[in-house]
Amino acid sequence: MKAYLVLATGETFAGEIANAKEDVYGEVVFFTGMTGYQEVLSDPSFKGQLVVFTYPLIGNYGINASDFESKEPQAAGLIVSEQSEEGHHYEATQSLQQFCDQHQLPLLTGIDTRAVVKRIREQGDMPAVITTDLSRVSFEEWVPLSERALVDEVSTKKVETFEGNGPHIVLIDYGFKQSILNSLLKRDCQVTIVPYDVSFEVVQELNPDGLLFSNGPGDPKQIEDRLPTIYRLASTYPSLGICLGHQLLALAFGADTEKLRFGHRGANQPVINLKSNRVYMTSQNHSYVVKEDSLQRTDWDATFKNINDGSIEGLTHKYLPIQTVQFHPEAHPGPSDSDEIFHSFIDDVAAKGREKTYA
């Protein structure tokens, strides 16, 4: 069936779709990884977004049972140049098209993705719609992602514990990826997942050894009412922030954030460790960054920077056992170069024990 990607600028790209039932609006972004489409479509950080894949052939290894980052699709739609009709992998349980049909996830094919990405790079991430009828298109009633309670949409509503013999880590869920949980469990941590709006008192009753502030979708300032609690928690327990968690911790301790013209989304983002000068290839998915000039009035030290655009990719607190990274050390998809971040965090937790930093 003929279908279209229509940008908010009015520019239209024609393609084909097999599973369209209604128009789907979202923020159009692009992902530069050659693989990892299954992780992308199920990553809560992509909530509400139409994802353009820059690699020309998507779906060639199908969908399997083990690479999901959440229990359901999170992206609003997928846009590809060409898709493989079959999944050629021994673990594949269905094709990408079959999965999208099953979950009513729009999969728009035959699109000139190079042209779309060029527009995004020139004009920034923007509203867009996948439609089969150009006469229906109207952005007047579309609710921008900046006005949606995205974290509330993806965060857990209950407390859940996974047993382990190591340190007890409370994972504050802003839209966490399954691979972050797996990275802690493989280190034999006991992990308790709590909602994003958890109170200090509830966390205190759980008696954690450390806290992990997870990734998630949207603008960190959408939940700035949580900053006082985040400040109190991170001042009390050794903490690691990843992606959105990194931004929230930065805000809670006095820094500021801003939106990039187009975000970092891919499995090939180079960052440099400012202390060792070691370069890492990292997996990233974010639209917002910490403003470097806002660090001057805080107790943060920058630890990582993006080599491509010089943006802040990591922080450590000068006096408290808090470290943050904008990238994803658990990867999935992507390289595991920065997996040592988890080791460093566990070392902080072990060194501190259950002693509070200060009351």
Curated annotation (Swiss-Prot):
The keyword ATP-binding applies. Its EC number is 6.3.5.5. Pathway: Amino-acid biosynthesis; L-arginine biosynthesis; carbamoyl phosphate from bicarbonate: step 1/1. GO terms for biological process: 'de novo' pyrimidine nucleobase biosynthetic process; 'de novo' UMP biosynthetic process; glutamine metabolic process; L-arginine biosynthetic process. Residues 1-168 are annotated as: CPSase. The active site is at 243 (nucleophile), 328, 330. L-glutamine binds at residues 45, 216, 218, 244, 247, 285, 288. GO terms for molecular function: ATP binding; carbamoyl-phosphate synthase (glutamine-hydrolyzing) activity; glutaminase activity. Residues 168-355 form the Glutamine amidotransferase type-1 domain. The keyword ATP-binding applies. Belongs to the CarA family. This is Carbamoyl phosphate synthase arginine-specific small chain. The gene is carA.
